[in-house]
């Protein structure tokens, strides 16, 4: 419970216990993501595409409307609260729990109801997740290594029902021929914009037809520009052993995770040293030192590559003929000032 150990027979509280080896998923580098779908009554919500983003975890729904809704995490004992429960933006990407090496975890206990979390006080109102790390085993030193390599393919238009350039131009032509009313005529490299230029005599019929032909042939692959087939590799090495009186466990872990979106990467290193000393059946102590460092690169939370690739018309170019970024502009607003040009490629490269 974070304070004491109680057998399942002696507890009437709502508690779920899982072993780390039973939920280990190759290619997933954090234990909070591995818990998804494994604990009854627990929801794990991934709110970001960043490779090391912290999922939102809810146990038996929300216990408050405006306050913090996240459970308290406890790593071994004694009970200590963690700042990862903060909703501040600085805790959005990466946290102390995500820094744990999953290979170092023995069991995970989830305390759900009031009787189970009462010992933690008001901080346990949203549930408590207790993580017990591995200990040394009696015997000669045992060295273990675990490593894996995972390859994920990028999303593509084959997986989604989106119009290609020719279909988009045909759809726009049908809307105009049906006299549909546009709240705002699309600007930039669109059929509607070219048609408006033709009607206002800014371009000739031949120039209009040339623009339409160019639009139909463009077929910009936004998924290819913004995403990649990502590679993840993780490594874990540990040594354990000892006697009945003194047991030790030492480990080191490394992971390199490429995000599906270009420019989003996470590199993590962790280390753990743990010594258990037992004088007799009544007296003993545990000394533990752990260390973790994470280096993340990514994009701003207001930039969503998937939404952009999914929603942007394929008639829109990514680059101008001179190789510079193509900037899209909206029509002038009521102030008469034009909006600043935008392209997600520039946003990703300068975030």
Q: What do these predicted regions represent?
A:
Residues 1-273, 277-288, 292, 334-335, ...:
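Short, small/polar-rich motifs associated with maturation and membrane association
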Residues 292, 297-351:
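Acidic/polar loop-and-plug regions of large Gram-negative outer-membrane beta-barrel proteins
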